Amino acid sequence: MSPPTVPPMGVDGVSAYLMKKRHTHRKQRRKPTFLTRRNIVGCRIQHGWKEGNEPVEQWKGTVLEQVSVKPTLYIIKYDGKDSVYGLELHRDKRVLALEILPERVPTPRIDSRLADSLIGKAVEHVFEGEHGTKDEWKGMVLARAPVMDTWFYITYEKDPVLYMYTLLDDYKDGDLRIIPDSNYYFPTAEQEPGEVVDSLVGKQVEHAKDDGSKRTGIFIHQVVAKPSVYFIKFDDDIHIYVYGLVKTP
């Protein structure tokens, strides 16, 4: 297995706060278009992708999820791409000629007990680099992916975006090793007895970059196995970022 392809944009850190919502009042409210569209979760799709002056690429993949806090946003695993993408398939002008395919997503049998034992674990994942060298990436197995039963969500220290791999064979072959310290990667957030921590899912986030510019996004998912860890979708990026947020005194 080759190392994951690192997306072109990186993030140094996230500072999150709730942003004031702007409410617009209209005389007539039109029913959102996504309510009348076919449910495409679990479907195989293909479409063109046009980025700036670059030639059109043809992408093919599987729709994993429709984000509940932002229903126009879909989570997709594209064939041949290691990272998971978040796209507004019906709104993004870069998506050309979206087509739903008649193909079915295969559902092979899986050792559920072994699969579940990997969830929430910090791991060392070994990839084969150039000239047969071994590259070791440390990260965390976040969850089993929806729809594609043999795949897992995973993220890495070197690149905090959401990736998807079939990890069981790597684990059996010794190329995926569990790090005994479960808090190695994402420390567990301290919580007072009886304290109830509100989820940030659906809240907006602002990130200040090193150059002083800012980017905005939204928390779209809280990791069940590690509640201090969230998936973030930034407005200016198609990748899904993974960050652990720990309360500071």
Curated annotation (Swiss-Prot):
Annotated spans, Histone H3K4me3 and H3R8me2a binding: 128, 237-239
GO terms of biological process kind: gamete generation; negative regulation of cell population proliferation; positive regulation of canonical Wnt signaling pathway; regulation of DNA-templated transcription
Pfam families referenced in this protein's UniProt entry, alphabetically: Spin-Ssty (PF02513)
GO molecular function, one term: histone H3K4me3 reader activity
Region spans: Tudor-like domain 2: 119-168
Region Tudor-like domain 3, residue ranges: 201-246
InterPro entries to which the protein is assigned, alphabetical: SPIN/Ssty, SPIN/Ssty_sf
Gene3D superfamilies: Spindlin/Ssty
Single GO cellular component term: nucleus
Site residues (Histone H3K4me3 and H3R8me2a binding), renumbered to this chain: 159, 170
Segments of this protein annotated with the region Tudor-like domain 1: 41-90
This protein's UniProt keywords: Cytoplasm, Nucleus
Subcellular location(s) of the protein: Cytoplasm; Nucleus
Function comment: Binds to acetylated and methylated histones, including H3K4me3 and H4K20me3, probably acting as a histone reader that recognizes chromatin marks and mediates downstream cellular effects. Promotes canonical WNT signaling, and is involved in the down-regulation of cell proliferation.
Illness the protein is tied to: Lui-Jee-Baron syndrome: An X-linked disorder characterized by prenatal onset, generalized overgrowth, extreme tall stature, enlarged liver and spleen, macrocephaly, dysmorphic features, and normal development. Hemizygous males are more severely affected than heterozygous females.
Assembly behavior: Interacts with C11orf84/SPINDOC. Associates with chromatin.
Record family assignment: Belongs to the SPIN/STSY family.
Official protein name in the record: Spindlin-4
Species for this entry: Homo sapiens
